Amino acid sequence: MRTVVISEVDSIHIPGNTFILDLNARAIKDCAGCWSCWQKTPGRCAFKDLDDFYTAFLQADKAVFFIGASCDFVSGRLKTLFDRMIPHYLPYTSWKTGESMHLPRYERYPDVEVYYQGAFSSESARHLFEEYLARVFYQFHIKRAVIKPLGGYEQCEVAI
């Protein structure tokens, strides 16, 4: 099984042959909104700082995110990554599900597991955090997304 790991948590042991995108170590440029990924070079961002990640993500069977919560929401680094994943989708939208969604560019996307850590101001804030992530991956045409606190990963020993 090919796995890609996206992490902003330092305490996770990840096997050596897994592609790792360390959001704490890698400087990722914000999306410029230039639309090059849709018009000039379809499917390819004008910035090249994530080319290796894009390839690994699209070739993976599973993408595992180890993330932190910041002020009851995802970090700015993770939000930037989500924004920069738009080249994986077509500029056209569909109303097939009763809501506007970009069409997939590729036939297959990896399953996703998200393990998060951080304190929340309330249980409803934690629930909203999980719902936001579920919606992101739904919009990304991810067929299977699991979202759990980091303790869920440590307890179930997910095979990477």
Predicted regions and their residues:
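N-terminal beta1-alpha1-beta2 submodule of the flavodoxin-like/Rossmannoid cofactor-binding fold
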Residues: M1-A63, I67-L90, Y138, Q155-V158
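A generic local structural motif
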Residues: D49-D52, G98-H102
